[in-house]
UniProtKB/Swiss-Prot annotation:
Its cofactor is Zn(2+). InterPro entries: Ribosomal_uS14, Ribosomal_uS14_bact, Ribosomal_uS14_CS, Ribosomal_uS14_sf. It comes from Limosilactobacillus reuteri (strain DSM 20016) (Lactobacillus reuteri). The keyword RNA-binding applies. This is Small ribosomal subunit protein uS14B. GO terms for biological process: translation. The gene is rpsZ. Zn(2+) binds at C24, C27, C40, C43.
Amino acid sequence: MAKKSMIAKCNRPAKFSSREYTRCARCGRPHSVYRKFHLCRICLRELAHKGQIPGLKKASW
């Protein structure tokens, strides 16, 4: 889990637009966040396996 202070810091408007960064909407993780889903790779994988993200399924070939 992300620190509450860092999540609060991310929610404030940045002084410069280049300082803004994405965080996972579910756990607050700052790295490897998919913009389309606003989820990190770990949360995306968990929800996809449970079938909670419509239109997303695990690839198999």
